[in-house]
Swiss-Prot record:
Protein's name in the database: Thiamine thiazole synthase
EC id: 2.4.2.59
Organism expressing this protein natively: Pyrobaculum calidifontis (strain DSM 21063 / JCM 11548 / VA1)
Superkingdom to which the source organism belongs: Archaea
Positions annotated to bind Fe cation: 154, 169
Reaction catalysed by this enzyme: hydrogen sulfide + glycine + NAD(+) = ADP-5-ethyl-4-methylthiazole-2-carboxylate + nicotinamide + 3 H2O + H(+)
Length: 261
């Protein structure tokens, strides 16, 4: 039995890694923005792979507000909650509360059911770039425990037509691309202190492409553009994920049309 268990895991696991070494969209971060983007892109028929450095979904959703098990979503984001069949409770002033565990479970299930692949325990180490002027064309990755050990292990590659940085406060993909491919012209301004009303609007407005092949969504937008943080309100994260999916879908459709022409 042990031999059969091991061989089944190795065979099918490596088949998945082989299959997803070339994708339409690679999303880094399985938080609210990344999972939302994954679902809406997969529904459009794109081959989507989500990298998550932890062995769990949800990003900052799980701890709720300072470990109190509720988060807040504003009215503008309710259509997204309804898409994912997430229940919500009115809290007044156009705000609603949501159970963090339910939101995590249904965002992840929604992305997976739409056809996205989520790979847990992966640290994205670098980007692939091509061309002059350059464009981002994929990612280099290793398993998170290897990265945490400090051992030098050469990474593997995933080729992607579009890469979305949904890594949160540190904007890790944009950060490494800015440092190692200066020709991309990227610069991180760093997020500011909290101003929720402003940030929830600006994070959606600034969501999108930051360089050819590279996009930013969620709280990573604040780090890139120097926007205020917002705390445990997640409507902006969800709407940012939906918007980046729309932007990426439009860009990839235009590229496909140009190739056919």
């Amino acid at each position: 039995m042990e031999l059969k268990i091991g061989r089944a895991i190795i065979k099918h696991g490596l088949e998945d890694l082989y299959e997803y070494s070339d994708v339409d969209v690679a999303i880094v971060g399985a938080g609210p923005a990344g999972l939302t983007a994954a679902r809406y892109l997969a529904e459009r028929g794109f081959k989507v792979l989500v990298f998550e450095r932890r062995f769990s979904f949800g990003g900052g959703i799980g701890p709720g507000g300072n470990m109190i098990p509720k988060i807040v979503v504003q009215e503008e984001a309710l259509p997204i909650l309804k898409d994912f069949k997430v229940r919500f409770k009115p809290a007044g002033d156009g705000l609603y509360t949501v159970d963090p565990a339910e939101l995590i479970a249904k965002l992840a299930a929604g992305a997976i059911d739409a056809g996205a692949k989520i790979l847990l325990g992966v640290h994205v180490d670098d980007v692939i770039f091509r061309g002059d002027p350059p464009r981002v064309a994929g990612l280099l990755w290793i398993w998170t425990p290897i990265q945490m050990s400090g051992m030098h292990v050469d990474p593997l590659y995933t080729q992607a037509k579009a890469v979305i940085d949904a890594t949160g406060h540190d904007a890790e993909v944009v950060s490494v691309a800015a440092r190692k491919v200066p020709e991309l012209g990227l610069q991180l301004q760093g997020e500011k202190s909290a101003w929720s009303e402003v940030s929830e609007k600006l994070v959606v407005e600034h969501t999108g492409r930051v360089a050819p092949g590279l996009y930013v969504a969620g709280i990573a937008v604040c780090a890139v553009y120097g926007l205020p943080r917002m705390g445990p309100i997640f409507g902006g994260m969800l709407m940012s994920g939906r918007k980046v999916a729309e932007v990426v879908a439009k860009d990839l459709a235009e590229v496909a049309y140009a190739v056919r022409a």
